[in-house]
């Protein structure tokens, strides 16, 4: 008897390696040969709970067993497999909801790069639409504080559809075996009905890999933007913590806290924690999770190492971007190129890929990437810190306009990532401009509802009150209800106001070390009153422009 060992996609590499070793010993005792390919095998033993969708298994006898039970009693499991192997039946890759009637059970997951705005706004949109249809729905949010409203095993089992609206990689292993549809938070928020229509047509059984989704998802979510946003999402807490610690340390310079006794060395300690550790780690974590998004877990270690090399060399965020993509695609390429016997396959992700990847990418970073990129970042930092007032105003206007063009979309995130990345190079003026501009659209919409109340419906006026609060918290997406109703006019007025706020902030050389927080981090701005003035002027510009160009017919 010839036996081939394999496992479900959700079984970890280390566990798979241990199972293979245990069953190799059990097979030797039972005089069963372990072979390296399904084609050679008389029986295929699958560890896990989901059969792999593998055409090589067609025509083979298979036996599937949970990995925990298999590990406890390998001899008994092997005997059962030899006696009870059944013909392989491939799992269906698509699900038809034709004829499904009555109350549907929907579970959903939402996640965005910052884990703040789109995560929760799309969750509300999904929940509202599902309840309107009379469905049972539960939405799990994967924000910066972790999973909220967590979906239970029982709820997964009862679900008719798993609806995933995520702009970054999120763990979905608990949904294996269920019909799943993937989309972005933006589409789930703005086109909820259309996305659910597509979900019921295009959902596929999720087997723990990357099979669930749509053609659109493959184009949009697997590209550069998704990889970058995965890195940004994991980097942000480090930037926030590091920036605020540095800002707090400055309080001692102004005798806000008495700088004596036990506090004497505290400023230097805080700066060391913020700048010496957090800011160095931010580039490594960013690169690590970019690589993780591309090559999964084998890419993480290589990306972290490459990112730390970029950070130590002074290559900044540009070096981190290159390090992350280089590490990810090198590891992904090695994974495809390197072919090993079945007995050694489990060593590839935990030994061979990290070792070869770290060596190749590390040496490439040290000798080819870091020297020129570090020089570029040095010149860029010098230019940004010594630029004239006119250049500063122009750059501020560009950053401000980009922050307001799509409010949480790719252009917005490009400007935001650029500004956040420069914090690691001790350049803080772009971050101040980006945050000021990002606060403008929602506050500007509130101003417009005050100025031209007769042009807005009662519900829009109420939305204006909510958008004001969101704007103060630096949540640009607070303006999205207005964008959905009147996109061209809202975007034009928002871009004008954002450019004004960004230009004023950069022109006044205002700095900010914290990348998020809105009104709550104003005390850590170099010029708080001037900064509030820049935001107010920008919001007023947006509000006045929109109040003028908005059509009365739009409110009907």
From Swiss-Prot:
The keyword Kinase applies. Residues 224-556 form the PTS EIIC type-2 domain. The active site is at residue 112. Induction: By fructose. Gene3D superfamilies: 3.40.50.2300. It is an enzyme of class 2 (transferase). Its EC number is 2.7.1.202. It is found in: Cell inner membrane. The chain crosses the membrane at residues 237-257, 275-295, 302-322, 324-344, 349-369, 390-410, 431-451, 468-488, 490-510, 529-549. InterPro entries: Bacterial_PTS_Sugar_Transport, PTS_EIIB-like_sf, PTS_EIIB_2, PTS_EIIB_2/3, PTS_EIIC, PTS_EIIC_2, PTS_IIB_fruc, PTS_IIC_fruc. It is a multi-pass membrane protein. It holds the Pfam family PTS_EIIC. Its main location: membrane. GO terms for biological process: phosphoenolpyruvate-dependent sugar phosphotransferase system. Keywords: Cell inner membrane, Cell membrane, Kinase, Membrane, Phosphoprotein, Phosphotransferase system, Repeat, Sugar transport, Transferase, Transmembrane, Transmembrane helix, Transport. One of its GO terms (cellular component) is plasma membrane. It catalyses: D-fructose(out) + N(pros)-phospho-L-histidyl-[protein] = D-fructose 1-phosphate(in) + L-histidyl-[protein]. Residues 1-85, 106-201 form the PTS EIIB type-2 domain. One of its GO terms (molecular function) is kinase activity. The modification Phosphocysteine is found at residue 112. PANTHER family: FRUCTOSE-LIKE PERMEASE, FRUCTOSE-LIKE PTS SYSTEM EIIBC COMPONENT-RELATED. NCBIfam families: FRU (TIGR00829), PTS_IIC_fructo (TIGR01427). The PTS EIIB type-2 domain is phosphorylated by phospho-EIIA on a cysteinyl residue. Then, it transfers the phosphoryl group to the sugar substrate concomitantly with the sugar uptake processed by the PTS EIIC type-2 domain. The phosphoenolpyruvate-dependent sugar phosphotransferase system (sugar PTS), a major carbohydrate active transport system, catalyzes the phosphorylation of incoming sugar substrates concomitantly with their translocation across the cell membrane. The enzyme II FruAB PTS system is involved in fructose transport. This is PTS system fructose-specific EIIB'BC component. It comes from Haemophilus influenzae (strain ATCC 51907 / DSM 11121 / KW20 / Rd).
